[in-house]
Every structure is written in C-alpha cells, then in structure tokens.
Amino acid sequence: IGLVGGVGNTANWVGLADVKLMYYGSDVSELSEDDSRFDVRDGTYGTVTVRQNLLSGLWNMVCLPFDLSSAQVRKYFKEVKALESVELAGEDCNLNFGNMRDMVAGVPYLVKVAQTVSVQTYEKVTIDADAVSSGATVVSDGAVTARLQGTFQKVVPYGDNVYAYEPNVFSKAETGTEIKAFRGYLELEGVFPKRLNLY
C-alpha cells in the first residue's frame, strides 16, 4: 500500500506504517431468533441486526455471537447478569447471577430492557461462530454442576435434566422442546431438584 507523491505523479511512493485491513463482509447482517441454521461468516460487520423479542419488566435470556462493550450494552439493556455459582440447599438448587457491564460472545446472559424490544441493531461488531461452544458457563458446588449453554440457532437439547428458560424462570424441558436462536438452556448434573431458584 502506498501513496503516489510528487508533482506530475512521477511514481515516487511513500510507504504507510501501522496499517490494518479489516474485513467487513457484507455491510449488513441480519439474525433472527427463528433461524434454524447459523451460517454467517466470521468477521467484522458494519451493521448487525438481531430480531428477538425481549419483554420489559422481566429477565430475558440473550446469547449473542459477538462481544458488546459497556456502551453498546447500554443501548438496549438496563441490567445484565451472568451465572456465577450454583448451590444445592436441600431440595432446592440455587443459581446465583452477578451484575455485568460488558457482554462476551457465546455467553448466555439474563438481561432487562427498559421497554419491549423486537429488533436490536449494532455497528462494527465481530461475529465469532465458535463462541457458542467456548462461551458455555459451567459452575459447580461439588454436589451439583450447572451448565448454561447458549444457542446461535434453534436447537432441541436432549438429556434427563435439561431446563428451558422463559422470562424469570427455568422449567424442566419436555422431550422435543425447541430452544430459539440467541437464547440458552440449562443442564444440571448430579441432582434432580424439586425447585430451581434464581438469585
């Protein structure tokens, strides 16, 4: 890369230092919680739109394929929490969530929105398709292990101890329960609790 210089353009070249080329793919990418396949290429995009219904006044689950800075988080979310620990207390299983400022690709979060949102739009974000595997949150107290797994496409999780999330509550998933894209579900190992509490 160079700049042509000199009067009359005499083919003198000046090199540029500290240059970075960025791939923006198609300038706009649109994602939806109803997507059955996640086939977006990794890379930085000028604009990414996420079609997802988030209800005001409730804790919604969100798992995005790109990082968000604290400034980007505040655009739509007034509160964000991530799973930090799990505790077995008799017949109860307590899931403890802590406040977060940033959001990491592939990690499922509980979020609150100031008003109901159906479309989110973000600029200059970098999509990482593999983050859905590496971003799963796993916590344990020795007696019970909880794995909060995000989704980038619709999935039907299998297992005896799988919980689907509806705003404010996890409930035992029936066989064949479909989890929407950009959400998440919970798997427990070592215990079948009567009650699952969120704190």
What are these model-derived regions, one by one?
Residues G2-W13:
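Short beta-strand-plus-loop segments that form exposed binding edges in beta-rich domains
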Residues V4, M22-Y24:
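Predominantly extracellular/luminal cell-surface or secreted proteins
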Residues A17-L21:
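Extracellular beta-strand elements of beta-rich domains used
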Residues S26-Y76, N96-N168, A173-Y199:
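A short, polar beta-strand/turn micro-motif
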Residues A82, E87, Y109:
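Contiguous mid-protein beta-loop-alpha structural module that forms a pocket-lining wall or clamp
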Residues A89-N96:
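Short linear interaction motifs
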